[in-house]
UniProtKB/Swiss-Prot annotation:
Stretches assigned to the Cytoplasmic side: 1-32
Signal peptide bounds: none
Protein task: Probable glycosyltransferase that may be involved in the biosynthesis of xyloglucan.
GO biological process: galactoglucomannan metabolic process; galactomannan biosynthetic process; mucilage biosynthetic process; seed coat development
GO molecular function per UniProt: galactosyltransferase activity; transcription cis-regulatory region binding
Descriptive protein name: Putative glycosyltransferase 7
Recorded topology in the membrane: Single-pass type II membrane protein
E.C. number(s) listed in UniProt: 2.4.-.-
Keywords for this protein: Glycoprotein, Glycosyltransferase, Golgi apparatus, Membrane, Signal-anchor, Transferase, Transmembrane, Transmembrane helix
Top-level EC class as recorded in UniProt: transferase
Lumenal side: 54-449
Length: 449
């Protein structure tokens, strides 16, 4: 991103008063003394009055219109110059049918006209998620999706991300797993201030509310997904990556990727053919239709020189992790983290939610430095993905017995919720029970229940 030119501001001051002249008489008369003392007394009264008003209670501070429209980070949300930008171009559309050209230049111009958004723009992120437009068939489906969404809202609030939730198709043909691409493109255009768009499936859950992605690692990349190069190029497996959670940079490269990616979806006249092509390469693909995940795999496999240099396949931690691998060990993870807190009083200290990242950084340095976040790690799993569970329809994979999916979801949701509600003084004492919560003792967990 090219930073705009900055101009320095100058404070100009002028004298408050000028000498009217100097006295020439060698002797000071009594009247002059009286006048001098009276003037000094009045000056003291004025100074006292000034400090009395300036030290008024902060609870009575008067807000002006300008300051009330600015957030604490200095972003001015009330300023939008009349200079023409891409929003004023009638040929630019948010839909997937028409490509967006010169997006980097368009976005740079918008930022230059809105300079208050430039500080912090390097990793500013908007999370995008969504679900179906109709009520769930599963009797508890809507409740589960609500709690999954609450989890994402909690994570975004803690880390300062914006979030956009879509529960409607933005293209009539792009449904199911393809619905994410129109939503992501629309979010890129709607949020030029954001460097990253973070797609998270409705059935994916943040189970480490402290962890943040290693942004520096992705500096030279435009797309981050959970995956493994060897499984793509050697095994040619359909499960070599998971497209249910990804970070995509808000840039022209990404716009073009979405156009190409979409070209293998239901809007393509060759949609049926693409499914056959994908299955001819990735032979463990379970169903004949072209899907977004295998389409991305196809691009990486067939056009490696074009896409692989800019796509980071994250395998060092659970960028999204298979729930059946994670949920059985959540109780052990809870105990490991409680042990850290028993060992160090800093982690037991009660604190405001707004400073949570400070305590997360302390835990990282004290206990987790150098610890990877995959299977068997001391870390909490970052994102737990309930693939195959279908919480809305209820038609989960037949390999999962009975209520395994729903019980696992409740346990993982409460595990994550404990990390949030602890800041509010309450926790789920039993991960299998959502309500009521228990108040946390003062020095918990060093002080017993």
């Amino acid at each position: 991103m090219v930073s705009p030119e900055t101009s320095s501001s100058h404070y100009q001051s002028s004298p408050m008063a000028k000498y009217a002249g100097t006295r020439t008489r060698p002797v000071v008369c009594i009247s002059d003394v009286v006048l001098f003392l009276g003037g000094a007394f009045m000056s003291l009264i004025l100074v006292w009055s000034f400090f009395s008003f300036s030290s008024i209670s902060p609870n009575l501070t008067v807000k002006n219109e300008e300051s009330s429209n600015k957030c604490s980070s200095g972003i001015d949300m009330s300023q939008d110059p009349t200079d023409p930008v891409y929003y004023d171009d009638p040929d630019l559309t948010y839909t997937i049918e028409k490509p967006v050209k010169n997006w980097d230049e368009k976005r740079r111009r918008w930022l230059n006209l809105h300079p208050s958004f430039i500080p912090g723009a390097e990793n500013r992120t908007v999370m995008v998620t969504g679900s179906q437009s109709a009520p769930c068939k599963n009797p508890i489906g809507d409740h589960l999706l609500l709690r999954f969404f609450k989890n994402k809202v909690d994570y975004c609030r803690i880390h300062g991300h914006d979030i956009f939730y879509s529960n409607a198709l933005l293209h009539p043909k792009m449904n199911s797993y393809w619905a994410k691409l129109p939503a992501v493109k629309a979010a890129m255009i709607a949020h030029p201030e954001a460097e990253w768009i973070w797609w998270v499936d409705s059935d994916a859950l943040f189970t480490d509310m402290d962890f943040t992605p290693p942004w520096r690692r992705y500096k030279e990349h435009n797309l981050v997904v959970h995956g493994w190069p060897g499984v793509i190029y050697n095994d040619r497996s359909w499960t070599a990556l998971n497209a249910g959670v990804f970070l995509i940079r808000n840039c022209q490269w990404s716009m073009e990727l979405i156009d190409t990616w979409t070209g293998m979806g239901p809007v393509s006249p060759e949609y049926a053919k693409w499914g056959q092509i994908q299955r001819s390469i990735f032979k463990d693909k379970l169903f004949p239709e072209s899907d977004d995940q295998t389409a991305l795999l196809y691009l990486l496999y067939k056009h490696r020189e074009v896409y692989y240099p800019k796509i980071y396949l994250e395998g060092d931690f659970y960028f999204e992790g298979y729930w059946l691998e994670i949920v059985p060990g959540l109780s052990n993870v809870t105990e490991r983290y409680l042990e850290m807190e028993r060992e160090d009083a800093t982690l037991r200290r009660r604190h405001a939610e707004k400073v949570s990242e400070r305590y997360a950084a302390f835990r990282e340095e004290r206990f987790l430095k150098g610890e990877r976040g995959g299977k068997g790690s001391k870390r909490r799993p970052f994102v737990t993905h309930f693939t195959g569970c279908q919480p809305c329809s209820g038609d989960h994979n037949k390999m999962y017995d009975g209520d395994t999916c729903w019980n696992g979801m409740i346990k993982a949701i409460n595990f994550a919720d404990n990390q949030v509600m602890r800041k509010y003084g309450f926790v789920h004492s039993d991960l299998g029970k959502t309500s009521p919560l228990q108040p946390v003792p003062f020095d918990y967990p060093d002080e017993p229940w």
